[in-house]
Amino acid sequence: MALQVQQTSAAFTISSPSTAAARIKLSPFRTVAVNRGVRCSGGGVGGGDAGKKKAVPNSNYVVPIDKFSSSSSITRPLIEILRDLNKKIPDNIVKSHDPPSTSAATSGFIPWYHANRMLSFYAPGWCGEVRDVIFSENGNVTVVYRLTIRGSDGEAHRESTGTVTTTDDHIEDPVTAAEEIAFCRACARFGLGLYLYHE
């Protein structure tokens, strides 16, 4: 699932614990990281190692966590956001298809988690939603996804679909896998990695 996740740090004061050991462990004014947001899972669209954890390669973008967490801080116009989304993606981010694709439509793809982070960097305040999930009689599942980007001068949205077969043994969760595809295609409709579909 590819939705924005935010993290914040908050200070909590704790009333007097009953034991000295508890006072040491839970000292007042200790900073505790609090995660809030939507659970994101990466179903496994590209191969049989969906259960393996993979390291995320270093990249040349950093997602600001606290600065842009509220939608009131958006000051960039849509034209600037779209210009930045159309920039070339660093080569260490672009992945090749594990089983090489039979169609020459795409030379590579951006994993959903990198697309998520890049959207959070270039278009803070973006919003994504699953509009429809369609189960076909032939064993396919299709997800319709809408991506909305907000700027200082308005908002724009793009919709796209992702389809996978439910009989593929390499895919643990077909709905999540279809959502990942639909999300990345919606990002491409805004220009993020669009050139990968033309090479």
UniProtKB/Swiss-Prot annotation:
Q: What is the lineage of its organism?
A: Eukaryota, Viridiplantae, Streptophyta, Embryophyta, Tracheophyta
* Function in brief: Involved in double-stranded DNA break repair.
Query: Is NADP one of the keywords?
Result: no
Protein name listed in UniProt: DNA repair RAD52-like protein 2, chloroplastic
Task: List the signal peptide residues.
Answer: none
- Give the location in the cell: Plastid, Chloroplast
Cellular component (GO) terms are:
chloroplast; plastid
Does the entry annotate any disulfide bonds, and if so which pairs? none
